[in-house]
Amino acid sequence: MIYIDNRQNSITVDENLQNTIREVIDYALKEEGMKISYEVSVIFVDNETIREINRENREVDKVTDVLSFPMLEYGEGKVFKDIYEECDFEDEYFDEGNLVLGDIALSLERAEEQSKEYGHSFLREAAYLTVHSVLHLMGYDHMVDEDKIKMRKREEEILSHFDINR
């Protein structure tokens, strides 16, 4: 189950955008080994709102493009597909039979700005940021170079399925 909640007025949210976000999330999760029903919540926000969320949750008082709030914890250097087969998730991780993976806050305003900066479509930028965030929900990180390389490679592999390349 993918919930999308539009909490901004800066960018028009049409059916194509919502469908693309849903398809990208579903495909990325399946590629990462998701074999059971899941739940991901996505909120579309503006720059000021994502700045507030960033400040409240990370103590970073600046605008960012996307924030991920994973519900599951993974061991150091582990991602979902590394632990899924041996993991017995407790009831607290489920809601109505769906494994709750976490929340994504996506600034559509910042995605629009970045699409212009990088010279590609808004839809491509929104899709990229969604894949990036989903991978965080699945345990990927980019704090050290080795992990960053692994994550970037995975992002591009997933996006290539949609013919949405950089």
From Swiss-Prot:
EC number: 3.1.-.-
GO biological process, one term: rRNA processing
Binding site for Zn(2+): 132, 136, 142
Keywords linked to the UniProt accession: Cytoplasm, Endonuclease, Hydrolase, Metal-binding, Nuclease, Ribosome biogenesis, rRNA processing, Zinc
Family designation: Belongs to the endoribonuclease YbeY family.
Cystine pairs: none
Cofactor note: Binds 1 zinc ion.
Enzyme class: hydrolase
Name under which the protein is recorded: Endoribonuclease YbeY
NCBIfam families assigned: rRNA maturation RNase YbeY
Cofactor: Zn(2+)
Cell location: Cytoplasm
Keyword rRNA processing belongs to the record: yes
GO MF annotation, one: zinc ion binding
UniProt organism field: Clostridium acetobutylicum (strain ATCC 824 / DSM 792 / JCM 1419 / IAM 19013 / LMG 5710 / NBRC 13948 / NRRL B-527 / VKM B-1787 / 2291 / W)
Function of the protein: Single strand-specific metallo-endoribonuclease involved in late-stage 70S ribosome quality control and in maturation of the 3' terminus of the 16S rRNA.
PROSITE patterns (alphabetical): UPF0054
UniProt xrefs under SUPFAM superfamilies: Metalloproteases ('zincins'), catalytic domain
A GO cellular component annotation in the UniProt record: cytoplasm
Designated gene of the protein: ybeY
InterPro entries the record matches: MetalPrtase_cat_dom_sf_prd (IPR023091), YbeY (IPR002036), YbeY_CS (IPR020549)
